[in-house]
Amino acid sequence: MGFGPCGLLGHSLGGAAAILAASKLKTVRSMATISAPSKAEHVRHLLAGSEDELLSEGRADITISGRTFELEAGFVHDLATHDVLGAVASLERPYMVVHADDDTVVRVSEGEALFAAAQEPKSFARYPDGGHLFGNRSHADRMTADVVSWFNATL
């Protein structure tokens, strides 16, 4: 039993992973990314101060917007092998970029690069505030409504 047509949504590095997956999965009929980098290796700047630990221990903890994540050396090494911009350029389906101007983790220029590389139909939902996590409830509600509208219109 397979899956029917679906929409795919990813946030931050998960957005880059969603783009890479959608470029291979024909059941993905529409997609959106929130605060996604245009290059998977973008995460390297988040390793400042942790690279020695990553090399010597094979793993390191990084903190993004107050949340701690464990990364393994193999994961970081693999990042350089993925072409996110090439994958988004190859998508032949609707794509929505969501990004906040004040995102300090993944700069809005990353979202602009994704949008520029994407084929039509495409949309850029840009918010003056919201940060990387859209932590303010009203910002999150507005962004969620926009993404749901996108999927309703494109699926």
Which positions does each model-derived feature cover?
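Alpha/beta-hydrolase fold nucleophile elbow
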Residues: 2-10
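Gly/Ala-rich beta-loop-alpha elbow adjacent to hydrolase catalytic centers
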Residues: 10-14, 18
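Hydrolase active-site cap/lid region
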Residues: 24-74
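Short beta-strand/loop motif that positions the catalytic acidic residue
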Residues: 91-92, 97-99, 103
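Short alpha-helix in the alpha/beta-hydrolase fold that links the catalytic acid
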Residues: 93, 107-116
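Acidic catalytic loop of the alpha/beta-hydrolase fold
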Residues: 102-106, 133
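Catalytic histidine neighborhood in serine/cysteine hydrolases
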Residues: 118-133
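Catalytic histidine-centered segment of alpha/beta-hydrolase-like enzymes
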Residues: 130-142
